[in-house]
Every structure is written in C-alpha cells, then in structure tokens.
Amino acid sequence: MSQTFTKSQVAEHKDDKSMYIIIDDGVYDITNFLDDHPGGAKILKRMAGKDATKSFWKYHGKSVLEKYGTKLKVGTLAEAAKL
C-alpha cells in the first residue's frame, strides 16, 4: 500500500535500517538496493533521507526509474502548503 510522506518523514529514513530517497514526487526505499546499485552504495547512503531528484536525473534516464521504481517505491511526497 502506498503512503504519503512529508520531507521531514523521509529525512528520518537515513540509516542502515531504513533508507528512503525522493525522486520527483515519489518516495523510494533503497535499503535493500544498496548492494545492487551499479554506482555503489556510497552515493545512495549520501542521499538517504533527501531529495535525490537532481542527482538521479543527472546520471540516469527514464528507463532506470521504470525498471526499479515499481519495486522500490513506497509512497509519494505530500504537497507542501503554499502561502
């Protein structure tokens, strides 16, 4: 079941027990993907708990998100209140 997360909730998931990243408006659990990431675990650990959108699109195409996204996506990012 998909959840809605705030940025602060995603930020809580930044250690070896639970690592989430944000890509666009999606929230992805990368905890069990670290060893499978072709670029290594280090960069994923550095981005854990953060918005990785710019970094992701700098190095990956749409096909990467299509391939892994459905397995890793745990929810969406809540819209920030606009003043």
From Swiss-Prot:
* Keywords noted in UniProt: Electron transport, Heme, Iron, Metal-binding, Transport
Asked whether the UniProt record includes Ubl conjugation among its keywords, one would answer: no
The keyword Nucleus is annotated on this UniProt entry: no
A cellular component term from Gene Ontology for this protein is:
membrane
One of the entry's Gene Ontology molecular-function terms is: heme binding
Q: SUPFAM superfamilies recorded for this chain?
A: Cytochrome b5-like heme/steroid binding domain
Chain positions recorded as heme binding sites: H37, H60
Q: Which domain of life is it from?
A: Eukaryota
Q: Which residues cross the membrane?
A: none
Q: What is this protein called?
A: Putative cytochrome b5 B11H24.095
The major lineage groups are:
Eukaryota, Fungi, Dikarya, Ascomycota, Pezizomycotina
